[in-house]
Design a protein with these regions (language model features):
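Structured beta-strand-rich core segments of catalytic domains in phosphoester-bond hydrolases
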Residues: 15, 27, 33-113, 228-230
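Glycine-rich, highly charged phosphate/nucleotide-binding loops
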Residues: 13-25
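Glycine-rich, phosphate-binding/catalytic loops in enzymes
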Residues: 20-22, 50-53, 88-89, 125-127, ...
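Residues at alpha-helix caps and immediate loop-helix transition turns in enzyme cores, especially N-
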Residues: 18, 46-47, 68, 120-124, ...
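Active-site-proximal segments of metal-dependent phosphoesterases and phosphodiesterases across multiple
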Residues: 112-128, 149-162
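Active-site environment of divalent metal-dependent phosphoester hydrolases
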Residues: 11-13, 41-44, 66, 116-119, ...
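Active-site beta-strand/loop signature of hydrolases that rely on acidic residues for catalysis
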Residues: 2-8, 22-44, 72, 108-111, ...
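Metal-dependent phosphoester-hydrolase catalytic domains
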Residues: 133-140, 148-258
Length: 258
């Protein structure tokens, strides 16, 4: 199964210029299921629902905002929930979907944690993690834009390396990009590349490239074989002078066995 996450950068001044690139990247990566962040209602209806070649898809808009989260899937989505509509889950900017493949039940959660508050990120990931540990599924997938790098408090909490507000992730989660990079003897490549991405061209940015976009799997006794993890959306198109987004997408190929 190919699973992917992609923040498509809802920047009004360049979005229509990049629209074809975004759709082409999504079609080319050909994931079985992909979570998208920074999706406007207009872009979802105009491009994703009609041009991305997915029969099953869903969009959930944040209350009072013009953007939200989307999931595109080769499999029927049998249950959907917006956690930002649930006060008991910290109104977390996350959407949860269930789907079945060959009798195996999957829970997939797509998140876009707040960029402007580490405290809010911590409270939201605690709520999301608690929600997912309350579910019954054969495999849990957590993906999205975490707005924090590897080694951040959110990442360390998910990986079982620290507590947050007296709570722990048990069982913990595994970051697929880190696992695959370790096997290959390589460093994990940044997904928010403030050095090479044209968004920051000529700006002499003070920001350091970070691995903000990640895919985690919850620890399970069931068998998981990680085949590959790659970035996509990294190429600059001459016509626009941009890559498709200011974030690079992450795609993982995983074999699941119950």
């Amino acid at each position: 199964m190919k699973i992917a996450t992609y923040n498509i950068w809802n920047d009004e001044s360049t979005l229509e210029l990049r629209a074809k690139q975004i759709v082409e990247e999504i079609r080319a990566v050909d994931a079985d299921i992909i979570g998208l962040q920074e999706v406007s209602a207009e872009f979802y209806n105009k491009h994703l629902a009609t041009e991305a070649s997915y029969v099953h898809h869903a969009f959930m808009q944040y209350p009072g905002e013009e953007e939200g989260l989307a999931v595109l899937s080769r499999y029927p989505l049998i249950f959907l929930e917006a956690l930002y509509q649930r006060e008991n889950y910290a109104n977390s900017t996350a959407m949860n979907a269930f789907f079945m493949v060959d009798g195996i039940r999957f829970s997939l959660t797509n998140v876009h944690l707040p960029w402007d508050s580490v405290g809010a990120r911590e409270h939201q990931i605690l709520a999301v993690d608690r929600h997912l540990h309350e579910q019954k599924a054969d495999f849990h997938i957590l993906m999205g834009d975490f707005n924090g790098d590897i080694g951040s408090s959110v990442d360390r909490y998910l990986c079982g390396e620290q507590t947050l507000h007296g709570c722990e992730a048990n069982p913990p989660w595994n970051d697929l990009a880190r696992a695959y990079a370790a096997r290959c003897g390589e460093a994990v490549k940044p997904t928010l590349d403030t050095v090479h991405n044209p968004r920051w061209a000529g700006k002499k940015s003070i920001y350091v490239p970070e691995v903000m976009d990640r895919i985690y799997l919850m620890d399970h006794w069931n068998e998981i074989a990680l085949e590959s993890v790659n970035l996509f959306g990294t190429e600059i198109t001459k016509k626009t002078g941009y890559v498709a987004s200011d974030h690079y997408g992450v795609v993982a190929e995983v074999n699941f066995r119950k």
